[in-house]
C-alpha cells in the first residue's frame, strides 16, 4: 500500500489557483528549425544585462576585440559582458536599451571585422574533478544569467542554494502563447541540455531532478525522453497547458505541491529552478569554454514573412533581426519584445538584444487589436479570480494610483509576477500590469534613496566617531606631554621652583608683599612707613652736613671733588705733610715779633694757583718728583739762612707769592700708596733737618723756607663718604693751624 501511494505521489502533479487559457499561436514559429543570421553592421552591448549593478569597463575606444573577450569586469553580483564577435570598439556611449521606460544606458559599440575569431577559450571538460568554487567562478566569469526572463546571476543563485536543496526543477513549460525559443532548443539540443543538468546536479547534489514541460510541445517531449534514456535520477513531468504555468512559484506548486511563502524564494522550501536555456548555456561554458554571447530568439507575428527561431548574438539591433524575418517597416510599426501578455512595446527598433530577450513579436493590424480606452474599475473581481499569485489586483491598483506605497507593499505587491492575467480579463481595459510596474519602480527608488541616506548617515556617524577618537587621542598626547617629562626636565623644574621659593623667602624678609583681597581696600601702611623712614634719613644727613659746614672755617683754597678714593688718599697725604711743615715753622718763628710778621703776611696777598688733577699716573709721578726737589731746596735754604732775623724772614715769606702746583692723582691704588709713602719719608727728613738747624736764626730760616712757592692742592668735594671723611680731616687740620696761630699772636 505504501509503495502504491509513493508511486502515485511520484507521478502526480498539482494545480494552482487562477490562470487563463489564451489562444495559442506557437505554430507560427515552432515548425521552423533554428538558423544562423548574418552579422549586423554594428553591435550595441549594454553593460547591464542582468539583475544587479553594471560592471567596470576594461576596454577603450579603438581597441581590437575577439569573440568571447570580456568587455567589463565582473565582481560579486556584477556579471561581465563579452564581445559577440571580433572587431573594433567604435564608441562607448549612452544608448536606448530594451526596457519599458525607453531610457538610455551606457553601452559599448563594436564594429565587426567579419572574421568572427574566438579568443582563448578555457574549458572544464573534467568538471567532476574540479571544486565547487572553481565551477561557480567559471560560470560567473562566463556571464551566465537566467535566460527565462529574470536575468538573475546563475552562479549567485547556485551559491545560495548549496545547502538544503532537495529538488532541482528544470523549467521547460514556456507558457507564453507566441514564444517557442525553448521549444525549438529542446527539440534540437536535448542532449546538451541534459549535460547542463548533470553539471547542475553535480553542484547542488539534489535528491531528485524534475523536468517540467507543457503538453503542447510533443516534439520537445519526445526529444527529451530520447536524451534521458533509462536515467532514473531525472524525471520528465508533462503538465497541462495553462498560463502562467511557467512561473517559478506556479511550476513549483504543480510539480511538488508546495507553495512558496510570501516574500520568499523557492529555495526556502528546498526547491531550486533553472531554465532549459540556462542549462544549455552552462554546458557551453563548462564543456566548450564559450561565454554567453548568443541565445535563441523567436521571431513571430503575422507581420513577418519568415517567422521562426534564430541564433541571435547579444547586442544585435532589433531592426536587423526583423529584417532577417522579412519584416516591412511601416510608418508607425508595433513591435513587442517578449510575449503579448508579459512583453512590452519597444520605443525604437534600434534597441539591442540582451540576455533576457527571448521573443520579438511583430503583429499585424488584425492580429492584435489596438489598445482600447481605459474605463473605470467596476470591481467585478475577475482580476482576483485570474491572479495565479492569490493577490488582490484591484486593491493594488488603487494603492498604485493613490501613491500609497506602504499599503501596496503590505499587500504583497512584489509577489506579483506581472503575468498580465488580470489585465487580460479586465472588462474595463485597465493596464494593471503597467500600474504595478510603475509602483514597483517608485518603491525601489524610495528604498534606494533611503538606503543611500542610511549609508550617508553611517558614513557621517563614522566620521564623527573618528573625529572624537582623534580629539581624544590629541588630548591624551597633550596630557602625556605635560606629565611625561624626563629626569633632567624634572631636575630643571625642581631647581626653578627652588629659586622661586628662595626669592619669595627673601622678599618676605625684606618686605612682605601686600595681600590684595577681592573686596577689601588696599593696605599701603608698609609702603608709607618705608617712605617716611627714607625721608627722615635724608633729613638727618642734611642736618649733619649743615652742622659740619658751620663748624669748619672758610678755606681760601677752593676745593674740588675727588672722583676716586685713590685721589682722596693722595690729598690726605699731602695735607698731613703740610700740617707737619706748618707746625715746624710755627715752632721756629716763636721768638719773632708778632706785629712785623702779621703785617708782612697780610701786606701781600697770597697767590693761590688752582691745581688740576693729573690725567694719568705719569703726571702724578712728575708732580711727586717736583715736590721732592722743592723739599731739598727748602732744607738747604733753612740751613744757610739760620742767622737771618725773624722780621726779614717774615717779609720774605709774604713778599713772594706762593706758587701752587696743580697735581693729579694717580689712577692706580698702588701708585697712590707709593706717593703716600714718599710723602711720609719727606716729612721725616724735614723733621730731622729742623732739629739739626735749631740754633740757626729764625728769621733767615723762615725767609728761606717761604721764599719758594708752596704747592697748594685744590681739593674737590668728594662724591662718596670716604671723600667726605678726607675733606673733614683737612678741615680739622686747618682749624688746628688757625688755633695755634691765634695763640702765638696773643703771646
Swiss-Prot record:
InterPro entries tied to this protein: 4Fe4S_Fe-S-bd, 4Fe4S_Fe_S_CS, Ion_transpt_RnfC/RsxC, Nuo51_FMN-bd, Nuo51_FMN-bd_sf, RnfC_N, Soluble_ligand-bd
Pfam families in alphabetical order: Complex1_51K, Fer4_7, RnfC_N, SLBB
PROSITE patterns tied to this protein: 4FE4S_FER_1, 4FE4S_FER_2
4Fe-4S ferredoxin-type domain sequence ranges: 368-397, 407-436
Keyword set includes Transmembrane helix: no
Gene3D superfamilies: 3.30.70.20, NADH-ubiquinone oxidoreductase 51kDa subunit (3.40.50.11540)
Cofactor note: Binds 2 [4Fe-4S] clusters per subunit.
Any one annotated GO CC term: plasma membrane
List of residues binding [4Fe-4S] cluster 2: 387, 416, 419, 422
EC number: 7.-.-.-
GO BP, sorted A to Z: electron transport chain
Location of the protein in the cell: Cell inner membrane
Superkingdom per UniProt: Bacteria
Cofactor: [4Fe-4S] cluster
Keywords from the named record: 4Fe-4S, Cell inner membrane, Cell membrane, Electron transport, Iron, Iron-sulfur, Membrane, Metal-binding, Repeat, Translocase, Transport
Gene Ontology MF: a single term: metal ion binding
Record's subunit section: The complex is composed of six subunits: RnfA, RnfB, RnfC, RnfD, RnfE and RnfG.
Its job: Part of a membrane-bound complex that couples electron transfer with translocation of ions across the membrane.
Family membership: Belongs to the 4Fe4S bacterial-type ferredoxin family. RnfC subfamily.
The name this protein goes by in its record: Ion-translocating oxidoreductase complex subunit C
Higher taxonomy: Bacteria, Pseudomonadati, Pseudomonadota, Gammaproteobacteria, Enterobacterales
Gene: rnfC
Amino acid at each position: 500500500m505504501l509503495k502504491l501511494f509513493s508511486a502515485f505521489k511520484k507521478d502526480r502533479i498539482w494545480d494552482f489557483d487562477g490562470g487563463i487559457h489564451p489562444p495559442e499561436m506557437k505554430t507560427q514559429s515552432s515548425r521552423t528549425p533554428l538558423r544562423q543570421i548574418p552579422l549586423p553592421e554594428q553591435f550595441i552591448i549594454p553593460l547591464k544585462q542582468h539583475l544587479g549593478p553594471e560592471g567596470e569597463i576594461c576596454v577603450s575606444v579603438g581597441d581590437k576585440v575577439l569573440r568571447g573577450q570580456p568587455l567589463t569586469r565582473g565582481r560579486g553580483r556584477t556579471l561581465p559582458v563579452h564581445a559577440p564577435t571580433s572587431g573594433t570598439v567604435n564608441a562607448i556611449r549612452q544608448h536606448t536599451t530594451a526596457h519599458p521606460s525607453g531610457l538610455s544606458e551606457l553601452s559599448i559599440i563594436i564594429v565587426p571585422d567579419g572574421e568572427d575569431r574566438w579568443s582563448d577559450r578555457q574549458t572544464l571538460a573534467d568538471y567532476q574533478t574540479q571544486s565547487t568554487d572553481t565551477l561557480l567562478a567559471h560560470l560567473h566569469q562566463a556571464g551566465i544569467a537566467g535566460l527565462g526572463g529574470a536575468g538573475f546571476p546563475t552562479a549567485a543563485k547556485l551559491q545560495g542554494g548549496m545547502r538544503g536543496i532537495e529538488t532541482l526543477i528544470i523549467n521547460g513549460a514556456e507558457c507564453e502563447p507566441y514564444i517557442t525559443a525553448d521549444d525549438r532548443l529542446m527539440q534540437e539540443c536535448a542532449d546538451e541540455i541534459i549535460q547542463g543538468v548533470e553539471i547542475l546536479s553535480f553542484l547542488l547534489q539534489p535528491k531528485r531532478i524534475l523536468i517540467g514541460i507543457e503538453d503542447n510541445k510533443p516534439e520537445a517531449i519526445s526529444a527529451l525522453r530520447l536524451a534521458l534514456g533509462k536515467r532514473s535520477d531525472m524525471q520528465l513531468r508533462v503538465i497541462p497547458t495553462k498560463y502562467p504555468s511557467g512561473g517559478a512559484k506556479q511550476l513549483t506548486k504543480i510539480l511538488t505541491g508546495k507553495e512558496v511563502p510570501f516574500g520568499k524564494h523557492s529555495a526556502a522550501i528546498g526547491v531550486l529552478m533553472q531554465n532549459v536555456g540556462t542549462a544549455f548555456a552552462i554546458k557551453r561554458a563548462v564543456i566548450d569554454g564559450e561565454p554567453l554571447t548568443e541565445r535563441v530568439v523567436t521571431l513571430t507575428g503575422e507581420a513577418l514573412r519568415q517567422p521562426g527561431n534564430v541564433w541571435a548574438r547579444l547586442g544585435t539591433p532589433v531592426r536587423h533581426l526583423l529584417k532577417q524575418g522579412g519584416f516591412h517597416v511601416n510608418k508607425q510599426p508595433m513591435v513587442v519584445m517578449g510575449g503579448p501578455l508579459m512583453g512590452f512595446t519597444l520605443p525604437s527598433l534600434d534597441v539591442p538584444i540582451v540576455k533576457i530577450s527571448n521573443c520579438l513579436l511583430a503583429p499585424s493590424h488584425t492580429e492584435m487589436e489596438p489598445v482600447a480606452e481605459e474605463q473605470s474599475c467596476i470591481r467585478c473581481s475577475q482580476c482576483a479570480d485570474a491572479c495565479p499569485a492569490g493577490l488582490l489586483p484591484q486593491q493594488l491598483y488603487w494603492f498604485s494610483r493613490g501613491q500609497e506605497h506602504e499599503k501596496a507593499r503590505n499587500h504583497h505587491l512584489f509577489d506579483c509576477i506581472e503575468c498580465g492575467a488580470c489585465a487580460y480579463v479586465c472588462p474595463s481595459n485597465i493596464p494593471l500590469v503597467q500600474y504595478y510596474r510603475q509602483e514597483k519602480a517608485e518603491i525601489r527608488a524610495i528604498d534606494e534613496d533611503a538606503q543611500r541616506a542610511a549609508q550617508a548617515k553611517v558614513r557621517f556617524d563614522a566620521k564623527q566617531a573618528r573625529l572624537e577618537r582623534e580629539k581624544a587621542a590629541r588630548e591624551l598626547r597633550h596630557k602625556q606631554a605635560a606629565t611625561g617629562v624626563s629626569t633632567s626636565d624634572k631636575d630643571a623644574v625642581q631647581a626653578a621652583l627652588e629659586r622661586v621659593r628662595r626669592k619669595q623667602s627673601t622678599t618676605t624678609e625684606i618686605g612682605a608683599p601686600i595681600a590684595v583681597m577681592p573686596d577689601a581696600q588696599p593696605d599701603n601702611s608698609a609702603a608709607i612707613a618705608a617712605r617716611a623712614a627714607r625721608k627722615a634719613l635724608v633729613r638727618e644727613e642734611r642736618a649733619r652736613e649743615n652742622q659740619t659746614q658751620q663748624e669748619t672755617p672758610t678755606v681760601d683754597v677752593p676745593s674740588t671733588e675727588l672722583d676716586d678714593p685713590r685721589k682722596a688718599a693722595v690729598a690726605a697725604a699731602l695735607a698731613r705733610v703740610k700740617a707737619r711743615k706748618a707746625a715746624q715753622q710755627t715752632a721756629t718763628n716763636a721768638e719773632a715779633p708778632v706785629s712785623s710778621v702779621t703785617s708782612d703776611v697780610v701786606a701781600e696777598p697770597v697767590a693761590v694757583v688752582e691745581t688740576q688733577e693729573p690725567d694719568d699716573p705719569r703726571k702724578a709721578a712728575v708732580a711727586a718728583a717736583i715736590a721732592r726737589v722743592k723739599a731739598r731746596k727748602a732744607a738747604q735754604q733753612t740751613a744757610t739762612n739760620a742767622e737771618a732775623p725773624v722780621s726779614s724772614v717774615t717779609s720774605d715769606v709774604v713778599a713772594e707769592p706762593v706758587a701752587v702746583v696743580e697735581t693729579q692723582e694717580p689712577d692706580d691704588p698702588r701708585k697712590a700708596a707709593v706717593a703716600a709713602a714718599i710723602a711720609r719719608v719727606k716729612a721725616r727728613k724735614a723733621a730731622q733737618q729742623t732739629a739739626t738747624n735749631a740754633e740757626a736764626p729764625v728769621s733767615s730760616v723762615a725767609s728761606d723756607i717761604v721764599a719758594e712757592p708752596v704747592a697748594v692742592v685744590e681739593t674737590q668735594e668728594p662724591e662718596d663718604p670716604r671723600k667726605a671723611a678726607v675733606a673733614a680731616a683737612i678741615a680739622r687740620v686747618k682749624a688746628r693751624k688757625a688755633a695755634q696761630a691765634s695763640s702765638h699772636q696773643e703771646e
